[in-house]
A protein has these predicted regions:
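Structural beta-alpha unit
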Residues: 1-4, 78-112
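A short acidic, glycine-rich active-site loop
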Residues: 56-71
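Small/aliphatic-rich secondary-structure junction motif
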Residues: 2-55, 83-90
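Glycine-rich, Arg-bearing micro-motifs that act as flexible, cationic patches
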Residues: 111-136
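Short, hinge-like loop/turn segments at secondary-structure boundaries
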Residues: 53-57, 106-108, 130-131
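Short secondary-structure boundary segments
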Residues: 40-41, 115-117, 146
């Protein structure tokens, strides 16, 4: 672990809690001259069918999901004070826990910042909290923001 952190990864999903996490991560990045990576991840819906009754092509589904993720990132960027911070963004498809952990490894993160609860109530009820799974499996220190 490196302190102060050189690279901070923050996961955003459009929820108020993830925005608070982004704000805190940006403050830490500014205070420590750290690089900030904002990531959003969406799990492709299983068995999703389009209005035609036919499954969408993987390309069409990926494009629609990525557009939604890009909007989440745009909103987070617009709502977060990123002045004076070196930062990047990433949008990915897959299991949020696995993808966020892989991003921490890929970016050589020193700190992961997440909101306590995300936007998906049903996912939390069925699969548990992403923050909880990250807390149990993160190879880097994790800051969970209420």
């Amino acid at each position: 672990m490196s302190w102060p952190p050189q690279v901070i990864v923050v996961a955003v999903d459009g929820s108020d809690q993830s925005q608070r996490a982004a704000d805190l991560a940006a403050s830490l990045a500014r205070a420590h001259t750290s690089r900030l990576v904002m990531i959003t991840v969406v799990r492709p819906p299983e068995g999703w069918w389009g209005v035609t009754g036919q499954p969408p092509s993987p390309e069409a589904l990926s494009e629609a999901l990525v557009e939604g993720q890009q909007e989440i990132l745009r909103q987070a960027e617009n709502r977060t004070d990123l002045s004076g911070i070196e930062y990047g963004t990433a949008e990915e498809l897959g299991d949020p826990t696995s993808v966020i952990l892989a991003a921490c490894e890929r970016e050589s993160a020193d700190l992961l910042v997440v909101g306590r609860r995300g936007a998906g109530l049903v996912e939390r009820m069925v699969m548990g909290s992403v923050a909880d799974r990250l807390a149990h499996h993160s190879p880097v220190p994790i800051l969970i923001v209420p």
